[in-house]
Amino acid sequence: VKTTTNLATLGMAVVLCGPTIGAARAEDWAQFRGPGGHGRSTTSGPVAWSRDENIVWKAELPGAGASTPIVVGDRIYLTSYSGYAVPKEEPGDLDQLVRHLLCVDLKTGKLLWDKQVEARLPEPERIRDHGYAANSVVADSQRVFAFFGKSGVFAFDHSGRQLWHAEVGDGTNGWGTAASPVLFGNAVIVNASVESQSLVALDQKTGKEVWRAKGMRESWSTPLLVPVGDETELVVPVFEKILGFDPQTGKQLWSCNTDIRWYMVPSLVADDGVVYCVGGRSGGALAVRAGGRGDVTDSHRLWTGRKGSNVSSPVYHDGHLYWAHEATGAVYCAEAKSGEIVYEQRLERAGQIYASALLADGKVYYLTRDGRTFVVAAKPDYELVGVNELRDGFTFNASPAAAANRLLIRSDRFLYCVGK
């Protein structure tokens, strides 16, 4: 059954009530790239769909955005922006820029609430490609946290009531802001590289600053929490390096040279204490074992490679890494142990791919900017399982999310629930 909802027309008239949010479930897609930030789902995913087939519901959004939908219980949270640069061809007045935090019912696609946040100006007048709502939100059973760059970090409860607001810097960049917050202990941690070249931890209850680590140069990546024995490290790629921190204190523990020039956008993945990086403007990849101290380039860096991606993040599965090049439409499989490229396959008429890869039920999903999803078997031998189109005339920059054996895919105009 397919339903279409216009969220923009529902607006603030929607009552702020709904089901109580229970304890967060392990399968909840409660942050950017889902559980652990690895882009891996424990549920199965659909294989075939189109604009008219296997669409559970389709909801029109009140604005554009590149943030990934997240899911907690039976609620979806995502951000968008309106008032300026929508459409891009007639941008209008920057003073009218508004950001939205949206809460949508997972089962029906109906809007439960829309919290509007005024932008702290000035912002770059034309953030290329992805606009003003690229940071995905993060949530637990009590709160929802949204990061809007220089406008700050906002905490809401699940009824949409704002709890606090904290600023983490006033810097801007022509590419805007994109890193998503993560939760650790009682803190919400943001990569404020654009805003203050800092990594900032805020108290989840009050928004007060817990710690701040400097040196976050030219990084748009979402931090990754990596288990190392009985401890946990917070790992982030920056200009020419990967840095490891103690998430309790913000103390830098180690650094590893990447030999990758210029800025970092893709986020990291890890398995069994090994961190994998695929990214950088100049391209490249590497693996480094977490848990070291000081400069670990010689002692813990396991391999480097020349193939990478400037935008989309990889997934790890069964000893292999899978990712897409953002510009060429090529997808890669590499052996995680050695970095050796197993295959490089160009997807037919793929165009640009900004969304990060998603793994579900032994399949890797690659979503292109024009709304085509290539489903590829997650195995060393390349096998194209299917190609599915949702072209709606708008851009698909956001990474897909998985929930209840379905996919959530958003464009700059619509949010789709794909499945049966």
For every predicted segment, state its role.
Residues 1-7:
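N-terminal secretory signal peptides that target proteins for export/translocation
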Residues 22-420:
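Noncatalytic, solvent-exposed loop/strand surfaces
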Residues 9-20:
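Bacterial N-terminal signal peptides
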Residues 5, 18-19, 25:
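N-terminal regions of proteins, emphasizing targeting and processing segments when present
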